[in-house]
Curated annotation (Swiss-Prot):
Swiss-Prot/TrEMBL keywords: Pyrimidine biosynthesis, Transferase
Top-rank lineage group of the source organism: Bacteria
Primary gene name: pyrB
Pathway this chain belongs to: Pyrimidine metabolism; UMP biosynthesis via de novo pathway; (S)-dihydroorotate from bicarbonate: step 2/3
Purpose: Catalyzes the condensation of carbamoyl phosphate and aspartate to form carbamoyl aspartate and inorganic phosphate, the committed step in the de novo pyrimidine nucleotide biosynthesis pathway.
GO cellular component terms, A-Z: cytosol
EC number: 2.1.3.2
Gene3D superfamilies, A to Z: Aspartate/ornithine carbamoyltransferase
High-level lineage: Bacteria, Thermotogati, Deinococcota, Deinococci, Deinococcales
Class of the enzyme per the UniProt entry, highest EC level: transferase
An individual GO BP term: 'de novo' pyrimidine nucleobase biosynthetic process
Name of protein: Aspartate carbamoyltransferase catalytic subunit
Catalytic activity, as annotated: carbamoyl phosphate + L-aspartate = N-carbamoyl-L-aspartate + phosphate + H(+)
Subunit structure: Heterododecamer (2C3:3R2) of six catalytic PyrB chains organized as two trimers (C3), and six regulatory PyrI chains organized as three dimers (R2).
UniProt binding sites for carbamoyl phosphate: R62, T63, R112, H140, Q143, G269, P270
Length: 312
């Protein structure tokens, strides 16, 4: 009996339907895209004739610019949709907005939205490939992919590597996406933060451990990721005080000494310097924070190519 392979995912909303082999292929292809970005002329015609709409219903600097550059590097046309200047402010529904944009013959959507699950709705309404650029607390898959790519770039593989993620896990779509992705690629993930900022459901994911002890999390880690305290998403009562948080959970030189020698430091940005991460570590020799930003473009080029052009 012939066993058919699962179909290629049409969208990148999260990692639920993505097999490890496809994820590895995305990262392999990012190497090719990285080579394109090293050329004197950093452009290829791979998406010529296609239109990508970046629909951001929430503020973004790195992700929006990275996606728009990625699409243009591959010769796609880009429609940049800003929710604040749209008919949404006049009461138009999300569904109607998406259907109007689809009528302009858009080939794919890149979506950021403050509501968890919004990217899934837009995929349903548009009938087009959708890349989730962050929806509420739920998922930010391309950030996790570029984090994985940065770690792989350093070590050659994620297999057997320990990744510690420290901070506001509860409100972080980045933490959730990394917790889903990295074990699929062979890494061990340890999430650490105050008990009030640790959602219990993540402990049930394969390859993921949850602790309130940052030293335990960082011990023997090959990569240490600091997360921003998302105070804009918090109500009162999550933290006793910021000072107490800094003393216990800040990723600084003292905490980093618990990690593997030469462990790399990551942060998805934006940084709150000297809150979740010390300036000495953020700017130090083990930091790969700017490398993450650089790698984001190659990874997002790979994702766009995979969804719009790639063939099995």
């Amino acid at each position: 009996m012939t066993v058919l392979a699962p179909p290629r995912p049409r969208s990148l909303l999260d990692f639920q339907d993505w097999l490890p082999e496809r994820l590895s292929a995305l990262l392999d292809n990012a190497d090719t895209m990285h080579q394109v970005l090293e050329r004197p002329v950093r452009k290829v015609p791979a998406l010529q004739g296609l239109t990508v709409c970046t629909a951001f219903f929430e503020n973004s600097t790195r992700t929006r610019i990275s996606f728009e550059l990625a699409a243009r590097r591959m010769s796609a046309d880009v429609i940049s949709f800003a929710a604040g200047a749209s008919s949404l402010s006049k009461g138009e529904s999300l569904r109607d907005t998406v259907e109007v944009l689809s009528a302009y013959k858009v080939d794919a959507f890149v979506v950021r939205h403050p509501a968890s699950g919004a990217a899934h709705l837009i995929a349903r309404y548009s009938g087009k490939p959708v890349i989730n650029a962050g929806d509420g607390r739920r998922a930010h898959p391309t950030q996790a992919l570029l984090d994985a790519y940065t770690i792989r770039q350093e070590y050659g593989s994620l297999a057997g590597k320990k990744v510690a993620i420290i901070g506001d896990i509860r409100h972080s779509r980045v933490a959730r996406s990394n917790a889903e992705l990295l074990p699929k690629l062979g890494a061990e993930v340890v999430l650490a933060g105050p008990a009030t900022l640790l959602p219990a459901d993540l402990a049930a994911l394969p390859g993921v451990t949850v602790t309130t002890d940052p030293k335990e999390a960082v011990h023997g880690a090959h990569a240490v990721m600091a997360l921003r305290l998302q105070q804009e998403r918090m109500n009162a009562g999550y933290l006793a005080s910021l000072q107490e948080y800094v003393e216990r959970y800040q990723v600084n030189e003292a905490l980093l000494r618990e990690a593997e020698s030469g462990a790399i430091v990551l942060h998805p940005g934006p940084l709150n310097r000297d809150l979740e991460i010390s300036s000495e570590v953020a700017d130090g020799p083990q930091s790969r924070i700017l490398k993450q930003v650089e790698n984001g473009q190659a990874v997002r080029m790979s994702v766009l190519y995979h969804l719009l052009v790639g063939r099995d």
